[in-house]
Amino acid sequence: MIRKPGQLIAVMLVNSLALVMVCRAQNGWTSSQVSSGGRDLNAVSFADSKRGWVAGDSGFLAYTEDGGSSWIERPLGIDRSINDIYFPTRERGFVLAGGSIFESSDGGHIWHEAHKFSPAEFDGATPELYSLRFNGKKRGWVVGSASRGDIVVNSIVAITRDSGETWQVLQVPTKQELIHIDFVDDRRGWIVGAGGAILHTDDAGETWVRQNSETNATLYHIDFRNEKQGWAVGERGTILRTEDGGQTWRSIVSPARSTLLSVQFVSEDDGWIVGRGGTILRSGDRGKTWLEQESGTKQNLYALFVDKKIGWAVGSRGLILKYQR
């Protein structure tokens, strides 16, 4: 159940310019297209207003150091889709692709495969990792699913206590596909996934219990501002809200019926959601009500990264939207 790090393959990356065409501005959102070869972008992460990363299908990975005016591709040498990119610090970053965790310690210039989960750990089923979080230098968690063909046969929740040197697969109270994880402090965290699954820990991810979401909709993303206040989004326009740490979840009326894929709050009041069909929603009252924003696109938006001044949304065929107050 505990594996040593996977084969270390240092990737000395050669810069290749990923050109950007700025198209239009709509209601504060500027649309551009990164030259991804038509590949979808599944993840976005920014260290500050200038330096950020996007990642997507067939191993596409690119970074910017000028606030998105230009992007430079950093090939990992893989053809698997990248599902998540996460920088817990400015220099230390992680990428998830298939059953592998890639790590960088120099701000994303050089990457190596730090760990690879094996089908043998899941009774021969193929692992796919979707979301990773660290809290401090040593303790981290990754979630996903194990499948045979197109059928998910088990969930994946794994923990590291030694900065990713080893990972232990945990037993959790669901076999559903698990898609996103969020921690609000060093002990309390939540996971969401298929079938309305919401899991919660209050012991730093050692054990997990299931919370009642009151829905069977697949939940794709969860965001907590503190130990009480959180939101989850999913298919068919599902928006859930809690004010008691997930002991109770309330369904919120959504102005969109499309699948919602990412939610993030920049303060206790101000939050954003993106989803399929170019959907962008915004709330200014702690997520009690939501208004649809004009995105200027009908393409799917798969991931979101926002702070108090700047926001980014990425999606189909290299689409990047930037919001600036």
Predicted segments with their positions:
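Bacterial N-terminal signal peptides that target proteins for export
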Residues: 2-12
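Bacterial N-terminal signal peptides
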Residues: 10-20
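Residue-level hotspots at or immediately adjacent to binding/recognition sites across diverse folds
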Residues: 23-325
